[in-house]
């Protein structure tokens, strides 16, 4: 019973949408039909975009309004997707038609990439001055302008690097000069300190000039010396009553 009721609801022409039930049939009112078309179209385009992004699917959507206006969406290209669809449908009887269509599609993409690579290689050779026979006068002028523009950029960058290198070397020269002056000052200071130390050691050595010889005393007058001694002797030994020493 439940399955039959569910099936009946699915087959019923009425579906519950939003706030109430909307009967799925042609809308007679032109204004309401246009408003509904815009809303449903935007929702359909949004779903197609989400499907292509989330599932990495190739999606192409084509919609014609009642007035014949075209609306389309494709994550790659509508024409490419249609061509792919035609190729897949033409070989629908064959079990490997889809894989063959995919193979053909990838072959076409590979051929496009090879053509792009060939063009880039030719441009590279032309920039080097090779394979110029197939170029016209206009192509040669365009090539010349590109090369001159490239050379101008290269020279500008080279000069910029040279100026930066010169500025660095000048700064380095100033630093070395300052370091040299500092080292010279330190060497001179060290030499002065050594000289002062040597001078102090020389001054402390005996017999150096700092120790002045004491001048010899005045010469004694021998006559005076003898006279004084004689007088002193007479004074000491004139006394006859001086007791003599006796040994016991």
From Swiss-Prot:
One of the record's GO molecular function terms: protein dimerization activity
Protein name: Floral homeotic protein AGAMOUS
Organism annotation: Nicotiana tabacum (Common tobacco)
An individual GO BP term: regulation of transcription by RNA polymerase II
Sequence ranges assigned to domain K-box in this UniProt record: 103-193
Residue ranges, compositional bias (Polar residues): 202-211
Region (Disordered) location: 196-219
Subcellular compartments: Nucleus
The keyword Nucleotide-binding is assigned to this record: no
General function of this protein: Probable transcription factor involved in regulating genes that determines stamen and carpel development in wild-type flowers.
InterPro entries to which the protein is assigned, alphabetical: MADS-box/MEF2_TF, MEF2-like_N, TF_Kbox, TF_MADSbox, TF_MADSbox_sf
Alphabetic keyword roster: Activator, DNA-binding, Nucleus, Transcription, Transcription regulation
Gene: AG1
Ranges where the MADS-box domain occurs: 19-73
GO cellular component: nucleus
């Amino acid at each position: 019973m439940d399955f039959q009721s569910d099936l009946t609801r699915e087959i019923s022409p009425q579906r519950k949408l939003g706030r109430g039930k909307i009967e799925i049939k042609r809308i007679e009112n032109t204004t309401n039909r246009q408003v509904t078309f815009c809303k449903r179209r935007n929702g359909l385009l949004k779903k197609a975009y989400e499907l292509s992004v989330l599932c990495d699917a190739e999606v192409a959507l084509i919609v014609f309004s009642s007035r014949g206006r075209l609306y389309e969406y494709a994550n790659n290209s509508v024409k490419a997707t249609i061509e792919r669809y035609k190729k897949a449908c033409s070989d629908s009887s064959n079990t490997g038609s889809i894989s063959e269509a995919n193979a053909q599609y990838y072959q076409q993409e590979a051929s496009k990439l090879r053509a792009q690579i060939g063009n880039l290689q030719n441009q590279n050779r032309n920039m080097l001055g090779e394979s110029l026979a197939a170029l016209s006068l206009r192509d040669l002028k365009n090539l010349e302008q590109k090369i001159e523009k490239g050379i101008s950029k290269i020279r500008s960058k080279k000069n910029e690097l040279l100026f930066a290198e010169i500025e660095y070397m000048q700064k380095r020269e100033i630093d070395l000069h300052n370091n040299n002056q500092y080292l010279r000052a330190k060497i001179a200071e060290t030499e002065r300190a050594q000289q002062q130390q040597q001078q102090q050691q020389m001054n402390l050595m005996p017999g150096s000039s700092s120790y002045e010889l004491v001048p010899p005393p005045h010469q004694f007058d021998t006559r005076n010396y003898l006279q004084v001694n004689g007088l002193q002797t007479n004074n000491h030994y004139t006394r006859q009553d001086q007791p003599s020493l006796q040994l016991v």
